[in-house]
Amino acid sequence: IGEEKFLFARVGIVGRPNVGKSTFFNCLLGRTRAIVGDFAGVTRDYKEELLDLKNFQIQLVDTAGLKSSLITAQDKMINKHTLDLISQLDIILFVIDGREGVTVEYKEIFQVCRKLNKFIILIINKVETTAIEQRFLQEDTSFFGVPNLIFVSSEHRLGTEDVITTLIDVCKKNNFKSVTKDNLDNDKKPINIAVV
């Protein structure tokens, strides 16, 4: 009898600072792992955890916020390291603050990510009311050109199941690799990038 196999993918939570990436990371994990705060730049290094979903394993990565305007040397360094990290992912969960709508900054950062040729799922976060969702739906999202757009409220843990279902569906349709439980840890390549 062969060993049971699992679909495996590296999935990164990506976006500009202060859109709720770390809260979303914790929400998907179901426990507090990343530090969260109400000001930009809380996550300057990345966090990662293995998310076990029956026959599906996700190496979930919470990345530092990307900026379109790089003013300081530290901004440039963080952007470079984050983009190096993103280049090693299979799927990007691109997070937008739904209360802000589609801004020029989101478009500029998304364009940078798109050039890395990764599968992108658009996550509209901080959607605590139907009014916020309806207002966002009036925005022109055609620029992003992605089939998957999911509304979530990480703070209230809403929309998580939709994200998980979409991730599993994407991995199945795109033939991501299968690994056995015994070789999962060996097969999972560590992402050795640090921002100091």
Predicted regions and their residues:
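Conserved G1/Walker A P-loop phosphate-binding module
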Residues: 1-75, 79-85, 173-196
